[in-house]
């Protein structure tokens, strides 16, 4: 599933081609996504794009009278293409732009979303989200407070969007490894120093992934069709049985609640 770095990579890739241009019309080939494509999107005509923002894993396209909310789901990607390039099987939505470009949404599993809203305030998908991990609001004081009485393992707690947004499975595993914290540790057992270190490495890991264009394991592509290259830097995720890059012990791979977890028994306590 595309996580925060992949969505931010998509935002940065599409923004220069959309802002200042006009949506001439939309082409919806298959509106049966996680939620049905909003009727307002079918009717788009000669609408300028004012900004392209991101909140958590949602892309937000600002229009004069409302917003398009895009979620990439499990397998979605957005590409900027020439208008004449024919659509393929899993290309479900196009925004045809006045500059000769097309924003094309591809999603083999159709678990993404294209929604329209007049205002973002109070929208159900955005209303109960925690702070952005790269913001000042996500800091050691905040994490320590939220972990203090939490009797659950730290890894699933990090992946809870009510705590902090966008730290999905890949980056939770990678950040806990970098911080030396076992994924099964109770959140309430973390010391102040461990909270400081964990916040620090989460920010570093996410920023590094954004620099590399995100992580491509299967479906994700950047807006220019290239994969994300952070997969080459993964320390534990997807490396079950391979030697830890620090101590040489085999990386452990387990599953909890249908989520794959990877860690090093030697380096993470």
UniProtKB/Swiss-Prot annotation:
Cofactor descriptive note: Binds 1 zinc ion per subunit.
Essential cofactor(s): Zn(2+)
Residues annotated as catalytic: 2-3, 57, 259
Reactions listed under catalytic activity: Hydrolysis of DNA containing ring-opened 7-methylguanine residues, releasing 2,6-diamino-4-hydroxy-5-(N-methyl)formamidopyrimidine; 2'-deoxyribonucleotide-(2'-deoxyribose 5'-phosphate)-2'-deoxyribonucleotide-DNA = a 3'-end 2'-deoxyribonucleotide-(2,3-dehydro-2,3-deoxyribose 5'-phosphate)-DNA + a 5'-end 5'-phospho-2'-deoxyribonucleoside-DNA + H(+)
Chain ranges of zinc fingers (FPG-type): 235-269
PROSITE patterns cross-referenced by the UniProt entry: FPG_CAT (PS51068), ZF_FPG_1 (PS01242), ZF_FPG_2 (PS51066)
Assigned protein family: Belongs to the FPG family.
Subunit structure: Monomer.
Protein name according to UniProt: Formamidopyrimidine-DNA glycosylase
Organism name: Klebsiella pneumoniae subsp. pneumoniae (strain ATCC 700721 / MGH 78578)
């Amino acid at each position: 599933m595309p996580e925060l770095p992949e969505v931010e990579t998509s935002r940065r890739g599409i923004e220069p081609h959309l802002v200042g241009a006009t949506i001439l019309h939309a082409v919806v080939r298959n509106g049966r996504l996680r939620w049905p494509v909003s009727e307002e999107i079918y009717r788009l005509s000669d609408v300028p794009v004012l900004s392209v923002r991101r909140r958590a894993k949602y892309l937000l396209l600002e229009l004069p009278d409302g917003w398009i909310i895009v979620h990439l789901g499990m397998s979605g990607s957005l590409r900027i293409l020439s208008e004449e390039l024919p659509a393929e099987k899993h290309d479900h939505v196009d925004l045809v732009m006045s500059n000769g470009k097309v924003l094309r949404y591809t999603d083999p599993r159709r678990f993404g979303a294209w929604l329209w809203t007049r205002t973002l305030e109070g929208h159900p998908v955005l209303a109960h989200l925690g702070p952005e991990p790269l913001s000042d609001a996500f800091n050691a004081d905040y994490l320590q407070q939220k972990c203090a009485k939490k009797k659950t393992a730290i890894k699933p707690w990090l992946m809870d969007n009510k705590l902090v947004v966008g730290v999905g499975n890949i980056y939770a595993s990678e950040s806990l490894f970098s911080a030396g914290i076992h994924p099964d540790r109770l959140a309430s057992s973390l010391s102040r120093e461990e909270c400081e270190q964990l916040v620090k490495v989460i920010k570093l890991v996410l920023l590094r992934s954004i620099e590399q264009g995100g992580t491509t394991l299967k479906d994700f592509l950047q807006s220019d069709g290239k994969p994300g290259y952070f997969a080459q830097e993964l320390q534990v995720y997807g490396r079950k049985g391979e030697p830890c890059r620090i101590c040489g012990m085999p990386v452990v791979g387990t599953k909890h609640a249908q989520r794959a977890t990877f860690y090093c028994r030697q380096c993470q306590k």
